[in-house]
Amino acid sequence: MRRGAWLALAALACAVPAWAQEAAAPDEWTVDLGVVGRARPLHLGSPRYRVDALPVVNARWGDAVALSLDDGARWAAFRDGPFSAGPVAEFRQSFNDGLPRGAFRMNDAVEIGGFAKLRTPVGEIETRLRKAETGYDGWSGDLSFDTGGQVAPKLKLGGEMRVSWADDRFSQEYFGLRRAAARREDLPRFQADDYYSAGAELDAARELAKGVALVGVLSGDRILGREWRSPLLQTRNVMTASVGFVRRF
């Protein structure tokens, strides 16, 4: 299933369900293509929603390499039984629809970092840490637990719980409505103004024909942290929903 969003903004991206994220056979490529309709907030903290359509493009080589429009790229460079770790590269899309007049429009960001994952009998525990090389230029991280499986011959369900963090450069740029002051960020910093969120996700996939599935995702996150006095933050709840079709090749 889709790996947990590192913070609520990532929940605005298209969620890809369990059916489209199963491990491929060892040393074999699998490709998933599809399209989903998505309902999401206009921007982080907005109570208003919009509906759009997004492509689903995923490629996996066994358990070693994963490429996705949603989750970026990752390579499990180190694998030892149920444990794996390696580098990740992700693209963060900023959502700037319906911003208040004069609000700072945060740029999209490319984030580079690493992940560590542990498979257990009941699910997967994963943590990630990334540095934004463009955009807000700060650090972010998340911790998630994913589980799921076959509940009927043609039906799979999945779930995720997650907590996420981003440093104060993100919250300054977004809720402060301005570009954060430039400073060197070689290592993660934890400050009183950092951004936190906690959330959960439910996935469902119903096989319609061999290699074709109807998929649906419902995701919710709660913005935590300090009480920012920002016209953007009209609600701390971020809900998204998507439904569509995916074809595996």
Question: What is the role of each PLM region?
Answer:
Residues G37-H43, W61-D63, A89-F95, T120-V122, ...:
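Transmembrane beta-strands of outer-membrane beta-barrel pores
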Residues V31, D63-L67, F83, V122-E126, ...:
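Repeated loop/turn-to-beta-strand initiation elements of outer-membrane beta-barrel proteins
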Residues Q21-S68, A73:
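Short glycine/proline- and aromatic-enriched beta-strand/turn motifs that initiate or cap beta-hairpins
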Residues L33-V35, V57, L69, A85-A89, ...:
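Membrane-embedded beta-strand positions of outer-membrane beta-barrel proteins
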Residues H43-Y49, L67, R79, M106-N107, ...:
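Solvent-exposed loop/turn segments connecting transmembrane beta-strands
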Residues W75-A76, T134-T235, R247-F249:
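Outer-membrane beta-barrel transmembrane domain signature
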Residues W29, Y49-P55, A59, G81, ...:
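Residues that define the transmembrane beta-barrel architecture of outer-membrane proteins
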Residues M1-E28:
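Cleavable N-terminal export/targeting peptides
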